[in-house]
Amino acid sequence: MAKQAKGMKSITNLAFEKTYGQMPSDGTWYQQPINKNALTGKQSLIQSNTITGRRDMTEPGIGQMDASGQLELPLDVRNIGNILKGLFGAPTTTAGTKEGTYKHVFKVTDEIPSLTIEKGFPDIGLFFTYTGTKFNKFSLTAQVGNNETTYTVDTMASNETEAKKTAATAPTALKLTRFNNVNASVKEGGTALATCRKMQLDINNNLDGDTYCLNGSSIRPSINEGMSEITGNIETLFEDDAQLQKAMNSTETSLELEFTRDNFSLTFSVPEVILERATPGISGPKGITQTLNFRGYYADDTGNSIITVTLINDVATY
């Protein structure tokens, strides 16, 4: 009986491309820890309506290649840096305040890099590579409860190819050190929001993947960046109307989600935010919570970005 591929033996590797859609011939490959990898290539079959005088349908047509899918990853101290680089572009890196640490600051840029991502099944000797991959949407939820802290990245790629051996012969594996929900804290308007139970943050690059051309292939020749969009929500204990009043009056505020572990930290700062009005309901006898959606924007903040992500760890460069 043939061997079945096992998820626990699978690998996900990534490398940044120098030219869009071309697997790098040099540079560093990274082995990325994942919880799930749904990146896949799909090519639809088009039903034929051709009439030939028989009841039998004729050969179907072949559609465009759609290489895309979602990655679910553990929130960690080091590997998150490569994901943030794919989401924003290369960071500005300086020495950290603690010995042996580095401060990486990510902001919105006009263009984001492309990657080659490899999804491998080494136990059966099959490897699928996705060239021209860009990160479209990042979603992270910090919340109370005994939940593993993970995040998702929606990807869009140019093409999928199959190989019998890995393209990443000696990938770099950064040590996995987790950030946990118990390491999280939230600030609103620059002040600790001690009653916060949950914060969801969505970063959307609004990529345009409808770039197919009549060029003799079925793949995307490019993927264009759209407007950077920041949305999400906060859930708090309903103890007063401090946040609700800001929502009712469309008062500008700010939000910050920070994870801290030892000398390392990860901070998402959205400096200009409007909370969406929604008064809390009553669903039973227990304590009342309120959930307010938010939307970030850029007007005049000195940080010159709709969002700033600061990662402090012991990795020298990304």
PLM regions with names:
Residues M1-Y318:
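Signature of extracytoplasmic/envelope-associated structural regions
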